[in-house]
Regions:
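Catalytic phosphate/metal-binding cores of nucleic-acid and nucleotide-processing enzymes, i.e., regions
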Residues: 2-126
């Protein structure tokens, strides 16, 4: 940083610049979640050979989990989150709960990934 130049504080920014910065952060957040999702899909295919992983259309049913995994005669849905503290969208709790009553559904993030995949493995093997 140049001598005498103060770092801009977010709240002091022009509203349009603040909006652009906010959008920038959301884009990074989504990119990171999508990276986690891509790695997760690869892990699922390795862990459950022959499974089919479908990325659900987020515009079709708001709050419906991101992924559906079909393996043998069983299925599961997974809602991917960048972190355990990531904000949940409206209806996500409802659909994860509803789908879990029918079969298996969880919120999954890097912090609980191992636990969720172990639970999923037990479900698919039962």
């Amino acid at each position: 940083m140049k001598r005498g130049v103060k770092k801009l504080i977010f709240k002091d920014m022009h509203p349009l610049l603040r909006l652009a910065k906010s959008h920038e952060r959301r884009s990074v957040y989504l990119m990171l979640e999508s990276q986690f999702q891509s790695k997760l899909i690869k892990k699922l295919k390795k862990l459950f050979p022959g499974c089919i992983v479908v990325k659900n259309d987020p515009g079709y049913l708001q709050g419906f989990p991101d992924l559906t995994v079909y393996y043998g005669d069983k299925w599961a849905t997974l809602e991917c989150k960048q972190s355990a503290g990531a904000k949940k969208q409206p209806n996500q709790e409802y659909y994860v709960g509803k789908m879990n009553e029918m079969s298996f559904s969880r919120f999954i993030c890097p912090e609980n990934e191992e636990e969720v995949l172990n639970d999923l493995q037990q479900t698919f093997q039962s």
